[in-house]
């Protein structure tokens, strides 16, 4: 993508020292090469290539290139686990297929193998095909989504697609088609993700929990990517520092660019700093910019910016809750409702576009009231901004500017604001009360 906007170029240049994670900087050659054979064609798509794949990762675990051949299909009928990798490039030039037998996959997950691909080690790069027709992981999630029981949000024994723990690495052209549920759990330091595609658009049942990237680490960037799914496009979890999410398009029934959820376990102290979400287009989503923490949590999230965000038909463009709940999860132990994950130095700048007034929400609602409407007084679905601070001291130095968000009904945009005090938030940009949004 050629970027010519001088202002945007300046913004991205300013981000570089913060969080555009470093690509592979190893000086050691990848001298070994393992080309993975496939039995897909000879068996008319019935043979399992997992043993050959596992063998390649065992043989070429260090200083190597592991190649899924160009234009070749592979059946990955059993999970692949490679946790002793070092200085390896995984070159995915063909297409990978998970089993289409739901019961067989559920039995594997019940046995304790709940992640289909597990990669771990320093300098582990993923290089997908340049050809858009190749480099796909096909999970056949549509059948799972359609099989989900009515009024249920959690079909049992669904696998996570991938756990990726590395450092000084790059992921390029990662492509996931119809994931069963969670896509990539990305943990580590100095990682760049570019030109990823997550396609979880459904023709039937709702694609619950199809998160794009669940991120935890330092100096991680995700750029120039497209994610259409039914949960967070990115969810930043603790501990995380110096994260950039830029020049991306997200949508379908996405839950947007999220931080959290945090604080469900009050003994887990949240520690997140320096996040940038910039130049992102959000289409038909439930949320665009979102923060979610549980009441009773502890910790600090500091220095967060959402900037230059374009929204089209989004129900909640800007949303903060410090009293989050999950319709499919419960909590145990003693909870102090006056305790919060503290939020400090948050900026929402240059938001433009349309608020979903006529058909708000998404297909994830299985309760009454819907989980995303619970606790919101007099909801009109004209809200440009929702800020739910847990206490009068838990939100500090909030700032909004350039908010140009308008309901499709052509009513005036409104705001729901709780406990973001003027004393702690002198540059909030509007008066913290429920009603018409009037920028100051």
Curated annotation (Swiss-Prot):
GO biological process: cell wall organization; pectin catabolic process
Glycosylated residues (UniProt): 24, 84, 151, 219, 271, 313, 350, 434
Organism whose genome encodes this protein: Neosartorya fischeri (strain ATCC 1020 / DSM 3700 / CBS 544.65 / FGSC A1164 / JCM 1740 / NRRL 181 / WB 181) (Aspergillus fischerianus)
Family designation: Belongs to the glycosyl hydrolase 28 family.
Location of the protein in the cell: Secreted
Active site: 231, 255
Function: Specific in hydrolyzing the terminal glycosidic bond of polygalacturonic acid and oligogalacturonates.
Reaction catalysed by this enzyme: [(1->4)-alpha-D-galacturonosyl](n) + H2O = alpha-D-galacturonate + [(1->4)-alpha-D-galacturonosyl](n-1)
Keywords: Cell wall biogenesis/degradation, Disulfide bond, Glycoprotein, Glycosidase, Hydrolase, Repeat, Secreted, Signal
Cysteine-cysteine disulfides: 389-395
Listed name of the protein: Probable exopolygalacturonase C
Main localization (coarse): secreted
GO MF term (any one): polygalacturonase activity
Gene that specifies this protein: pgxC
Superkingdom classification of source: Eukaryota
């Amino acid at each position: 993508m050629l970027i010519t906007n001088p202002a945007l170029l300046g913004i991205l240049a300013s981000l570089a020292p913060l969080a555009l994670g470093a690509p592979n900087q190893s000086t050691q050659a990848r001298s070994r090469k393992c080309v993975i054979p496939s039995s897909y064609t000879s068996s008319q798509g019935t043979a399992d290539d997992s043993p050959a794949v596992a063998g390649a990762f065992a043989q070429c675990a260090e200083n190597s290139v592991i190649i899924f051949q160009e234009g070749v299909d592979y059946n990955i009928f059993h999970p692949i686990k490679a946790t002793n990798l070092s200085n390896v490039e995984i070159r995915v030039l063909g297409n990978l297929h998970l089993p289409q037998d739901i019961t067989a996959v559920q039995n594997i997950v019940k046995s304790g193998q709940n992640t289909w691909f597990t990669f771990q080690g320093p300098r582990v790069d993923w290089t997908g095909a340049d050809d858009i027709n190749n480099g796909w992981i096909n999970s056949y999630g549509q059948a799972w989504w359609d099989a989900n029981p009515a009024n249920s949000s959690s079909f049992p024994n669904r696998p996570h697609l991938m756990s990726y723990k590395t450092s000084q690495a790059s992921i390029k052209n990662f492509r996931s088609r119809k994931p069963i549920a969670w896509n990539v759990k990305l943990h580590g330091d100095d990682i760049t993700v570019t030109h990823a595609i997550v396609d979880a658009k459904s023709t039937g049942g709702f694609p619950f929990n199809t998160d794009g990237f669940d991120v935890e680490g330092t100096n991680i960037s995700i750029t120039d990517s497209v994610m259409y799914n039914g949960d967070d496009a990115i969810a930043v979890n603790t501990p995380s520092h110096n994260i950039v999410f830029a020049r991306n398009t997200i949508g379908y029934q996405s839950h947007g660019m999220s931080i959290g959820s945090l604080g469900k376990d009050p003994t887990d102290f949240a520690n997140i700093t320096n996040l940038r979400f910039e130049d992102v287009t959000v289409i038909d989503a439930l949320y665009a910019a979102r923060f979610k923490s549980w009441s009773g949590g502890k910790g600090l999230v500091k220095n967060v910016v959402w900037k230059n965000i374009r929204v089209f038909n989004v129900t909640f463009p800007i949303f903060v809750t410090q009293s989050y709940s999950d319709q499919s999860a419960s909590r145990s132990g003693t909870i102090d409702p006056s305790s919060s994950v503290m939020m400090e130095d948050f900026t929402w700048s240059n938001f433009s576009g349309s608020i979903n007034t006529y058909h708000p929400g998404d297909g994830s609602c299985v309760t009454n009231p819907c989980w995303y409407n619970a606790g919101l007084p007099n909801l009109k679905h004209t809200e440009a901004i929702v800020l739910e601070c847990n206490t009068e001291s838990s939100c500090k130095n909030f700032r909004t500017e350039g908010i140009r968000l308008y309901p499709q009904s052509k009513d005036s945009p409104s705001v729901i604001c709780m406990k973001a005090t003027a004393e702690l938030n002198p540059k909030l940009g509007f008066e913290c009360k429920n009603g018409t949004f009037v920028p100051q």
